[in-house]
Amino acid sequence: MYAQVAVENVNCTFDKDYDYSIPQQLEGKALVGCRVAVPFGVGNRKRIGIITRLTDSTQGKRIKSISAVLDEAPLLSYEMMSLARWISEQTFCTYYEAVKAMLPAGINHKIIRSFCAVPGVDESIVASLDSDEKQVYDYLLSRSGYVKPENFLKTLGFDVSSDIPERLLKAGLLAANDDAVRNIGDNNIRMVRLCEGSDDVSMTKKQSEVVNVLKDVGSVSVKELCYFTGYTPSVISALEKKGVVECFEREELRSFVSRYAVQSAYDSGEIHLTDEQQKAYDGLLEDYKSGTGKTALLYGVTGSGKTSVYLKLIDAVLADNKTVIVMVPEISLTPQTLSVFHSRYNDGVAVFHSALSAGERADEWKRVKNGDAKIVIGTRSAVFAPLENIGLIIIDEEQEHTYKSEQTPRYNAKSVARYRAAWHKGLTLLAAATPSVDSFAAAKSGKYSFYELKNRYGKAVLPQVVTVDMRNEQQTENRELSHELIEELNKNRTDGKQSIVLINRRGYNTFVSCTACGEVVTCPNCSISMTYHAANGRLMCHYCGYSVRFTQKCPSCHKPALRYAGFGTQRIEDELEKAVPGARIMRMDTDTASSRFAHEECLNAFAKGDYDILVGTQMVAKGLNFENVTLAAVDSVDQQLYNDDFRSLERTFSLLTQVVGRSGRGEHPGKAIIQTLTPENEIIRLAAKQDYDAFYDTEIRMRRLMIYPPFCDICVVGFSGADEVKTRVASQRTLDKIKELTAGKYKNEKLIVLGPLPARVPRVNKKYRYRLIIKCRNTKGFRSMISEILKDFYGDSKFSDVSVYADMNPEITV
């Protein structure tokens, strides 16, 4: 019997299924969807792979054998194996990279190599070693068994990345052993139970009491048994030696309980819909019942009650014994969403997002795979939840860019959702107050079903929106907080109401410059200005993480003339404390919400009224529902509005609409303030009116004229290398290859190629970056051409130190 195996850590040139024989002792264990350890390459170093197919014969010669099967049962179903193949073809990644994206990090394996000395080696070989090699060899000779290199290298004072062990291995002085090790172990509990036929064994009084407890409870953890009886584990050990009891391990899944989830108005009761909501629900239910794998768009203004429609639809899906995935774009939305679903569906809900530890993520994944949870809630990775019989996938705030992965594999969760829903003949539901232009166009064309909620739920009305011209404010030295905003914030606090203020920049000041020579302090690794963070007194790069303590000495002219400029969330927090005396202010950005449960803690405290003002970045703008918030403000949108990405207008309109929508969601009317240097801008004017339809009409005309999605697809081919000239030459070579192929066998592929050009931030982490932007159609022929180009590039040794990737329809093209 033979297995075809997709192996990890290969580039696209070598991405294929490799044949391995299955040893007799592993037959019946080596199944499709199981991971295996296999020898790979000339040196036969072990690598992790996954079995994609079993066969009775092979055309290969000198077939190697599988070393070990790493899973007791297949991790991936036939559907997920097919999905991995589809992702690898769509996103230009390897098959195993697609597989790895589907699995939680906590169940991943890695190969750990250890070494031992080979005794009795020819003395002349030992004599030829240099002093460092001799020191390592002698040390390992003195040790028994295999030792991990990081252990003995550190002990001997060498860098743990030293190649000394590999040199000694090549010389035949060391032997190596490769083991596949789980990243995170199972959470096992030591249990105890009675053995059969042990009644006649003589026991002490303590031992008899322990046995009597076990007769009542059956099996129990050692820890609990000691607690109940008041005895130490030594009593249990003595009984185990006598054969009266046996101890065993039981896995206990680490359950994620949202301890800080905000209170929810939803419970298990009947959901009552308005006529408008009922109409949308009826249509969506019909789409779901059709069993044809449809996609629908639910377009509803902020506060229109989309969640009520979701829940009623989910009730219908669960009644059919089917499962549900609910995706949200930001971790900050997960606590509120989770509280809604937990209050209604209890432990039938699992959660996938990065605030969980690796062990918790692994256990939630197991809980879903075991069938213990029928609903999965989470961010982008939740789309890979190992659910069977999926009836509904909801993508909330579907316009958000976070549904697109910026790392390999560069998948779009919306596309994966449509694939999975079609496979299970379920429904994909996209929902938003400001749908993406692409999705709205698909709905307009009839590709998606379309439903609309035009009114806010209950008595709530859309807030009054005021646009403040900051050019006038700056003349009076009010640089960031206008008179009107300060007045409204104070009034809101006096009235016992809450406010949300958004500023889309982290840190205290957005850059630091020298007043003597004009130099802006930039990151030494990246071509980007550094941001001052007052909390730790450091300048930080938000791209590579480099930081340095702030001093006033200019690194260019060396004069003590460095000054802050620009405003970040930390600075606005300080300004608000001065402008609204006595206000309780909470700042929420990736700096303050980076710890586990930080989002829950922040949102729960704000929901309970512990704070008057919530100030933060985009994470405070979307999907949050606080009935006591009657004022929402945007500090400045001009930086986002006037950048060079073709989606900048769409993103700005969406952000403004979302922020405005946080206000007045309860019984009290709301107000929103937009501060801008260009109040006459059409996008700002339309966002103030919450007029998405007019925005769409304007935007779609521009996209048609300029040939941007949805009137084409865009593929970005990116290059990165430490040598700028070589990186630029690599991008030009690829352009020449595209011209060659489109003049020949791919002549039917119609393209518009822009570049090569430096990326918007041309240097990150000491590497220069170039881009080719290709306007195309995402056809099988085009993807085949790009795959051929990538394989050709990786096969050219001249560019071995330049990395390349292709990204289809990225959210950010520059």
Regions found by a protein language model. Name each.
Residues 1-432, 444-460, 780-787, 791-809, ...:
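Accessory, non-ATPase domains that flank or precede helicase/AAA+ motor cores in DNA-metabolism machines
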Residues 2, 30-32, 347, 726-740:
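A short, contiguous, amphipathic alpha-helix enriched in charged residues
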Residues 16-18, 221, 713-715, 768-770:
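Short amphipathic alpha-helical segments
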Residues 63, 762-775, 808-814:
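Short, low-order "capping/linker" segments at domain edges
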Residues 175, 586, 741-759, 800-808:
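Short beta-strand elements
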Residues 264-274, 278, 282, 292-728, ...:
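Inter-lobe coupling/hinge segments of SF2-like helicase ATPases
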Residues 733-745, 785-796:
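Generic non-transmembrane alpha-helical segments
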